[in-house]
Amino acid sequence: MFTGDIMDIVIRKMSNEDKKEVIDMMEVFYSSEAVYTNGSLEIFENDFYACISDNPYIEGYVFVSEDEILGYAMLAKSYSTEFGKQCIWIEDLYIKEEYRGNHIGTMFFDFLDKIYKNVLLRLEVEDENIPAISLYKKSGFEVLPYKEMMKNKRL
């Protein structure tokens, strides 16, 4: 748990009690232009349960003030052979619209810097998401010259 002095915000790991609110936020996030796919309730539930289980590859956090969840984040763990160290992918970072601009994102990146020392942090952002890009650059992220590609195999 991490406590900030801005709005008395606490960053804590997700718990089962957070399910409805986190999934509601995921539905908003995944229906926005910030992501490539719209997801589905099945995917959102799988992601949520992976975050609250002992799955070593994913962690989920919520940002809370006075018992209200203001946003959430999901992190995926991997290893970067290019940089020779652990890599944390910030898969989801969502803050409810009415709480944006309150430095919650900055507080979350400070939190990550404290718990993940000497770890590569990566994320994806749409070119049009200027406020997010500004936050990420202020937090020390750099634009990479790569194109992101994927192959989505369904069994």
Q: Where are the language model's segments positioned?
A:
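A short helix-loop-beta-strand connector motif used in the catalytic cores of GNAT acetyltransferases and
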Residues: 50-62
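Conserved acetyl-CoA pyrophosphate-binding loop and the N-cap/start of the following alpha-helix
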Residues: 99-111
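Conserved GNAT acetyl-CoA-binding A-motif
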Residues: 109, 116-126
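Conserved beta-strand-loop-alpha-helix junction that forms the acyl-donor binding cleft
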Residues: 122-133, 149-154
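Conserved active-site alpha-helix within GNAT-family acetyltransferase domains
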Residues: 106, 127-145
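Conserved beta-strand in the GNAT
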Residues: 60-62, 68-77
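Conserved GNAT-fold acetyl-CoA-binding loop/helix
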Residues: 27-50
